[in-house]
Structure formats: C-alpha cells, structure tokens
C-alpha cells in the first residue's frame, strides 16, 4: 500500500536573472509556459505529488536572481532543504555565477556538501548554446550533484529536475541520520570503557590507602 503521508520539502530555485527559474517553477506547478520575462522578487508555490511511491508536498521558492536582491539570499538559503541551481545554456555569465551560489549555500549551511541539482535550462535553444554539456557535467561532478538539461518551453525534464532534488534530499537525510546514529553508538561504546577505567583507578587508590593507612576511601 502506498503511503498517504505527505512529507514537506522546502525547495529553492536559485540562479542568475533571466535563466528561466520562474518558467520552470510555473511549468511544474501549473503546466503552463510563461513566455515573457518578468523579474521575480520572491514567489512561493506548493504542489502535492508522489515520488517513488511516497507522498510529497513540494514547497517551492522561486527567488530573485538580480544582484540588487542578493541581501535576501542568505535568508532563504537558511530555510531551504535543497536547491536547484539553474543557468541558461545560451549565457556564459549565468553559468559562471553557479559556483558563487553554491559556495554561498555551503557557507550558510556550514556544510561541505548539501542537496543540490544543477539545471541547464533552455536546451531548446541548442543553436544558440554557448555552454557545452560537457562543461555542465564537469561542474556538477565538482559539486557532487546530478546534472539535468531542461526546457521550460517544451516541458522537458522539468518534473525530473525537481523530483531528482527530492530524491537527493532523501538520500542526504538518511546519510545524516546514519552518521548521527554511528556517532551515538561510538559515544555509547566509549562510556563503559571510561567508567571501567575510573573504577580501576578508584580500586587501585583504595588498595594503596588500605595498605598504608587502613582508611576507607569515599568517592
């Protein structure tokens, strides 16, 4: 039986201005392509779906890419559980900005890695491409993340990009939980050894005192 529980995932769409963040988000939520470019300050959308047999409620934050809104970035980076890092394959500058966004996420989260998916958008404009697929794949490899080429206009790999991020979050959380459990197990295993060491020290002290003074040791 499939689960009816809807686990909420806070997804944040990040990238330079004009790369198609809003178009991707609205295609996911409304199955509609927004042709005109209207710079976003911050919009939030929610979508119920099922991913690998598990219910999910996607809370998607579509963010501003313009430099004048950069002060807002750290605020949404603190709350995001996973990030779509989006660039436009016809814009070299949008590709170059990805590393800056990624490093800022790691700094805010104080982590060496974090759930992200690298999204190369506007792949329907192949004739105008200036960032090769190989370059995108290499960048994704350096960030230890999945690489997806999308077209908001053609609705190509839109769901795959968002759903892959949810899967990445799930794997990351399981890994973090396992690491925490292992740490707890190590700490628990160390307690008896530490206790035994203290007990041994007390017994040795007691023996020495009994021999020399015949006094009782209170500890």
Curated annotation (Swiss-Prot):
Q: Which residues carry this modification: Cysteine methyl ester?
A: 216
Q: Where is this motif: Effector region?
A: 37-45
Q: Name one Pfam family in it.
A: Ras
**Binding of GTP: at which residues?**
15-22, 62-66, 121-124
Which reactions does this protein catalyse?
GTP + H2O = GDP + phosphate + H(+)
Lipid-carrying residues in chain (S-farnesyl cysteine):
216
The reply on keyword Ribonucleoprotein is no
Please report the record's description of how this protein sits within the membrane: Lipid-anchor
- The organism's superkingdom is given as Eukaryota
- Propeptide residues, per UniProt? 217-219
Which EC number applies? 3.6.5.2
One MF term in the entry's GO annotations: protein serine/threonine kinase activator activity
Q: Which GO terms describe its biological process?
A: conjugation with cellular fusion; establishment of cell polarity; establishment or maintenance of cell polarity; positive regulation of conjugation with cellular fusion; positive regulation of mating projection assembly; positive regulation of pheromone response MAPK cascade; positive regulation of protein import into nucleus; protein localization to plasma membrane
User: How does its record describe regulation of its activity?
Assistant: Alternates between an inactive form bound to GDP and an active form bound to GTP. Activated by a guanine nucleotide-exchange factor (GEF) and inactivated by a GTPase-activating protein (GAP).
> One cellular component GO annotation, for this chain's record?
Cdc42 GTPase complex
CDD domains linked: H_N_K_Ras_like
* Keyword Ion transport included in the entry's annotation: no
Arranged from A to Z, the UniProt key words for this protein are: Cell membrane, Cell shape, GTP-binding, Hydrolase, Lipoprotein, Membrane, Methylation, Nucleotide-binding, Prenylation
For this protein, what post-translational modification is recorded in UniProt? Palmitoylated by the erf2-erf4 complex.
Sequence similarity? Belongs to the small GTPase superfamily. Ras family.
Q: How does it assemble?
A: Scd1, scd2, cdc42, and ras1, in its GTP-bound state, act cooperatively to form a protein complex.
User: What is the purpose of this protein?
Assistant: Participates in the process of sexual differentiation and the determination of cell shape. Essential for mating and for recognition of the mating pheromone, but not for vegetative growth. Does not regulate the intracellular cAMP level. Regulates two downstream pathways, namely the byr2/byr1/spk1 mitogen-activated protein kinase cascade and the cdc42 small G protein pathway. The former is relevant to mating and sporulation, whereas the latter is relevant to mating, cell growth and cell morphology.
Q: What is this protein called?
A: Ras-like protein 1
Q: Which organism is it from?
A: Schizosaccharomyces pombe (strain 972 / ATCC 24843)
